[in-house]
UniProtKB/Swiss-Prot annotation:
Single GO molecular function: DNA binding
Subcellular location: Nucleus
Gene3D superfamilies in the cross-refs: Classic Zinc Finger (3.30.160.60)
Keywords carried by this UniProt record: DNA-binding, Metal-binding, Nucleus, Repeat, Transcription, Transcription regulation, Zinc, Zinc-finger
Protein name: Zinc finger protein 775
Native source organism of the sequence: Mus musculus
InterPro entries: C2H2-ZF_domain-containing, Znf_C2H2_sf, Znf_C2H2_type
A single Gene Ontology CC term: nucleus
Family indicated by similarity: Belongs to the krueppel C2H2-type zinc-finger protein family.
Gene (UniProt): Znf775
Translocase recorded as keyword: no
């Protein structure tokens, strides 16, 4: 049998071995060589250390495609080493081999990977496997780095710091995105006021403000304020300049035009991040730094609610609102108190509860049971429970004939009010009757056993108890949403029917709810007094 090695003896008596051409040697030992041997031959031929060829694709195809493990050299450096029949010229590789790719192929989508671990992680997208579980909220992830980034939301860790402004971020990509605001020059200049912008879209939005300025210069400035106030109510903003911003920023106007007309801005009119907001809502004039924030805000005007609850069908405009709502169905309480171990569904409820553990919370502690309350108002509401319990015990003692309980029963009877008619109420104090115009909350005769709140009517107590029981007997026939009170269902159905029964007598605009009409009528009070309806005159 021919051998790929030829031997010779030198003059010093030592045997020397001569190695033949690598391609012929490879053809000879291809059937017996292992993958490691072939890799060593390639590295010796190319003159590269093992670290430079490690991880590069050397095998293409899978056992399902070729009927076995297929081995092929690299198209750039290892083409001369491909096994071929002696005497034939080396031809080009097939397209499947020269296209490159990884050693490991996904059987579901055909994507190739150079490492087995990469293929294993990729296959979790097809199987849905998420082996990394968060110990705080129970959310699972397919990769460990995603879990590490998620846990920073619970711990509040922000390891990435901006060297320019020392602002910190929980993810590196957020830091890189933020650093562009420092490095990117403001090359887009407004020809009218010479204000500079980093993005072309910011300049276009700013130029729209100039167009509005030219139109607004021909109208009264007070009319502009009233129009902006009317749009502001639909945006759920409070009266006045929002968050202390200057009026020209709030209205989306140009600062130079605002200064030329001698209009005085607010006291806090320093240049700051609020004045660099580029995305302005066309409906109410509110400005935002990010396009995503403006997109979410515009759902207030359009009424879009793309996030639906799979349990009850209720829709929300933002995903965090849906997440908090789902905890009502699952019972999840991801926010525990570090002092007493009590858990809450929302973080704001936890912060409110933590006030009871502060040193000053001793002043709002119940003297009967020792329970701490977040405020004195909550303490008074809590003490009504003890008062109601004492009244019920005294009344039951009178019915059972317990001696010495008549005095307590007389006290209990003195604080019970019995309505006598629509003109007023009669109360019994010190054995005398007198008419009262208002019944104090402590003298209402129907008391809730859960929270101690009192009511003058049994129907009001029945409606109130649905808060504790969760009963919602009034269902919408269109979307299935349920309500605890019928008036709430009536107002909700106007969203489906489009009915607007409350009309403005000044401009004829219709509203679904009366409170929206009353807010709107404040716009007309500067020019003409609104005509009160029959319900407002009462």
């Amino acid at each position: 049998m021919e051998s790929g090695l030829a031997g010779s003896i030198s003059g010093d008596g030592l045997a020397r071995i001569k190695q033949e051409k690598p391609e012929w040697l490879l053809q000879t030992v291809a059937s017996q060589a292992t993958e490691k041997d072939k890799e060593n031959i390639f590295q010796q031929q190319s003159g590269l250390p093992p670290c430079q060829t490690m991880g590069r694709p050397r095998a293409l195809g899978s056992q399902e495609e070729t009927g076995g493990t297929r081995w092929a050299p690299l198209p750039e450096q290892d083409a001369p080493l491909a096994a071929r029949v002696p005497g034939t010229a080396p031809g080009p590789l097939s397209p499947s081999l020269s296209a490159g790719g990884g050693h490991f192929v996904c059987v579901d989508c055909g994507k190739r990977f150079s490492w087995w671990s990469s293929l294993k992680i990729h296959q979790r997208t097809h199987t849905g496997e998420k082996p990394y579980l968060c110990g705080k909220c129970g959310k699972s992830f397919s990769q460990k780095p995603n879990l590490v980034r998620h846990q920073r939301h619970h711990t509040g860790e922000r390891p990435f710091c901006c060297p320019e402004c020392t602002r910190r971020f929980s993810q590196k990509q957020h830091l890189l995105k933020h650093q562009k605001t420092h490095s990117r020059p403001a090359t887009h200049t407004c020809p009218e006021c010479e204000r500079c912008f980093r993005h072309q879209v910011g300049l276009r939005i700013h130029q729209r403000a100039h167009a509005r300025n030219r139109l607004g210069a021909r109208v009264n400035l007070h009319e502009m304020f009233r129009y902006a106030a009317a749009r502001r109510w639909s945006c759920r903003l409070r009266p006045g300049s929002p968050r202390g911003h200057p009026e020209w920023v709030w209205l989306g106007l140009c600062r130079s035009w605002w200064g030329q007309h001698g209009v005085r801005t607010t006291a806090h009119s320093r240049l700051g991040p609020s004045e660099q907001r580029q995305f302005i809502c066309n409906d109410c004039g509110k400005s935002f730094t990010w396009w995503s924030s403006l997109n979410i805000h515009q759902r207030i005007h359009t009424g879009e609610r793309p996030y639906a609850c799979p349990e009850c069908g209720r829709c929300f405009s933002q995903k965090p609102n849906l997440t908090r709502h789902l905890r009502n169905h699952t019972g999840e309480r991801p926010h525990p108190c570090s002092h007493c171990g009590r858990s809450f569904r929302q973080k704001q409820h936890l912060l409110k509860h933590l006030r009871t553990h502060l040193p000053g919370a001793q002043a709002a502690r119940c003297t009967s049971c020792g329970q701490s309350c977040p405020s004195r108002a909550a303490l008074r509401a809590h003490q009504r429970v003890h008062t109601a319990a004492e009244l019920l015990r005294s009344q039951s003692a009178v019915r059972d004939g317990v001696p010495g309980s008549e005095s307590q029963a007389e006290i209990a009877q003195s604080v019970v009010v019995k309505p006598q008619g629509p003109q007023g109420a009669k109360e019994v104090l010190c054995g005398q009757e007198c008419e009262t115009l208002a019944v104090p909350s402590e003298q209402r005769q129907f008391i809730c056993n859960e929270c101690g709140k009192s009511f003058s009517w049994w129907s009001a107590l029945t409606i109130h108890q649905r808060i504790h029981t969760g009963e919602r007997p009034y269902a919408c026939p269109d979307c299935g949403r349920c309500f605890s009170q019928k008036p709430n269902l009536t107002r909700h159905r106007r969203n489906h029917t489009g009915e607007r029964p409350y009309l403005c007598t000044a401009c004829g605009r219709g509203f679904r709810q009366k409170q929206h009409l009353l807010k709107h009528q404040r716009v007309h009070r500067g020019t003409q007094a609104p005509h009160p309806g029959p319900e407002e005159e009462l």
